[in-house]
From Swiss-Prot:
Associated with the spliceosome. InterPro entries: G-protein_beta_WD-40_rep (IPR020472), Prp46/PLRG1-like (IPR045241), WD40/YVTN_repeat-like_dom_sf (IPR015943), WD40_repeat_CS (IPR019775), WD40_repeat_dom_sf (IPR036322), WD40_rpt (IPR001680). This is Pre-mRNA-splicing factor prp46. Belongs to the WD repeat PRL1/PRL2 family. Residues 61-129, 432-452 are annotated as: Disordered. Involved in pre-mRNA splicing and required for cell cycle progression at G2/M. GO terms for biological process: mRNA splicing, via spliceosome.
Amino acid sequence: MDVIPSTTPGEAVRISAKRTAELFGPEYLMVTPSASNGSIGVSYRRKTEYEHVKELPPALAAKQAQAAAARSKRPKISSRSEGSGSGDKSGASTALVRRGGRASGAAGDDKPTSLIQRPSATRQQPPEWHAPWKLMRVISGHLGWVRSLAVEPNNEWFASGAGDRTIKIWNLATGALRLTLTGHISTVRGLAVSPRHPYLFSCGEDKMVKCWDLETNKVIRHYHGHLSGVYTLALHPRLDLLVTGGRDGVARVWDMRTRSNIHVLSGHTGTVADVQCQEADPQVITGSLDATVRLWDLAAGKTMGVLTHHKKGIRSLATHPREFTFASASTGSIKQWKCPGGEFMQNFEGHNAIINTLSVNEDNVLFSGGDNGSMSFWDWKTGYRYQTIDTTAQPGSLEAEAGIMTSTFDRTGLRLITGEADKTIKVWKQDDQATPETHPVTWAPTLGRQRY
């Protein structure tokens, strides 16, 4: 006969409570397993499962050794100040100024930085002061809308193409007509003067791209391939390449001398309205009426990126002459981008019109011309609009003909040339009498900047 061991009432209560918890209690009432038991199981599994990979391969071991050696060579920042002596055994620092330039006893050390620092929106870069622009000269002679302009590299003359199917050469200093070139059978939409050759390139709505020899004033080459009107062209600054774009929705890259079509840059679903070539990178930038900007790798002839931030058709592009940036314009919107990847930088807000043309000079002045005759001048760095004026249609023209069709700065950046719908060419210059006191910058930082 078994003898039941005697238990005290307290022990019986603990045993009963333990049994009840094991049977009916939730997981958080269960007895915690011993840590030693878990470590034994982990060590056993490590030994049985990872025995064959305990040693790293020689190549990986050498790579990790090099990384460890590089980390050990980095200078370590000691917790003490450099001026403390070797006999200082106490843990307290004797430095008067903490690392970071703040005094050790300064008030508010434990305050969050958000209460001390200003928001980034209120620390915007102030715009640079620019002199306002005023009308200098009005040049008449064309019988149609002036749709294209190009300045000669030596800054002695400029060319204009218009709806009267002619190209006219003007003296930049006096505005006198020097020459008229005929050959197109429709509106001349694009002009470019080669900086290395005595060539003038033109394109028009007659599907033609022509190369003019300025020594004989005759056409020496035709570039055939476009299926519809050619609206824009650009020369690569370093290579003998010509890029054209038009209503057929493609941009074509031509060898200037052999007239061969090197690439057909297809991808746009609308008219290619403007083309720019990037000097520091073999890249072509195209803007289209399908509201996209495409960045093309000129070597491969393929798309590098598509910028879809605009909501309406893009009619003009402008690359900065010295910086690695460019701008694009659509109806009521101008955006600035970074090359070569097309990272968005900022908006130029305020020009509510159909923007036909953009131009930028080396002094960081951006000009935008609208279909309704509105003109805006911007600071390229900050996007601040420092001047707005409206052009005036010439006597005998309709009010609806007060539109800016094309624009360009001369080689010095001190003269702005605009081609307008009233069949005139206007030359603008900066006001020599203006000072920061007479025309102050009325700028205030914006708290909420529109991202895209």
